[in-house]
């Protein structure tokens, strides 16, 4: 009886089964983002027996660069961070860039949201509220772009013009007159998403993880997880304990 030659998918699944846990690096040390992204990744289904797991820079012994966000868009800034961290760690990395866009301000502060004012998140919230004093149109949206990059820049996504993957998400709502709630971070205490009577600062992680700009962008990321796993399986180094990196953890 002639044996059937294993298909590429069968061979891939066998290799993934040996790996069990596959790691991808979050290109941020922000503890709020680590928590938020960890929640996103925990909801991903396994591919065969392999699971894509998020790790943070604090889990590795690498020295990571300070990345200046000099891009002209969320995507460019996210790519700068993802590519730099991927090269430093020798493993795939995911990064995001985000901002709040206020209709009455022509989309500002946008990509400058994190640098719109010196000081803390609270200082930036107060800066924006001052800018909006006396303005009745409170329409705004949170925007985010997520990027996955690889250390060698190899294109695995079928897009000849680029060597990374990106996905965008937007969450529309209105600006509150004053901060409400102590949950979340950034501009969360003054952003009320459409369909809700509370700010992100009041709603908490359970709701935010379903409707936020990053959550919407991550749905696009989730669609290409099989491609990410396939790439890692093909390039997997058996001495790396399941990840594609040169750092230890």
Q: What is the role of each PLM region?
A:
Residues 2-8:
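Extreme N-terminal basic, low-complexity initiation segments
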């Amino acid at each position: 009886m002639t044996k059937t030659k294993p298909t590429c998918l069968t061979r891939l699944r066998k290799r993934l089964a040996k790996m069990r846990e596959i790691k991808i690096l979050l290109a941020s040390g922000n503890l709020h983002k680590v928590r938020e992204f960890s929640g996103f990744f925990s909801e991903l289904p396994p591919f065969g027996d392999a699971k894509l797991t998020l790790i943070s820079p604090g889990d590795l012994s690498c020295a990571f660069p300070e990345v200046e966000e000099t891009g002209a868009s969320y995507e460019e800034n996210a790519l700068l961070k993802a590519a730099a961290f991927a090269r430093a760690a020798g493993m795939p990395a995911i990064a995001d860039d985000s901002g709040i866009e206020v209709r009455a301000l022509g989309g500002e502060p946008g990509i400058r949201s994190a640098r719109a004012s010196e000081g803390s998140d609270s200082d930036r919230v107060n800066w924006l509220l001052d800018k909006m004093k006396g303005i009745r149109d409170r329409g705004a949206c949170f925007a985010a772009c997520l990027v996955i990059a690889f250390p060698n820049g190899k294109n695995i996504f079928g897009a000849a013009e680029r060597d990374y993957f990106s996905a965008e998400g937007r969450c529309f709502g209105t600006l509150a007159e004053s901060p409400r709630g102590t949950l979340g971070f950034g501009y969360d205490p003054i952003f009320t998403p459409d369909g809700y009577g509370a700010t992100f600062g009041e709603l908490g992680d359970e709701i935010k993880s379903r409707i936020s700009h990053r959550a919407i962008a991550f749905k696009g990321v989730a669609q290409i997880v099989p491609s990410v796993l396939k790439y890692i399986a093909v390039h997997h180094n058996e001495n790396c304990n399941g990840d594609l990196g040169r750092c230890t953890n």
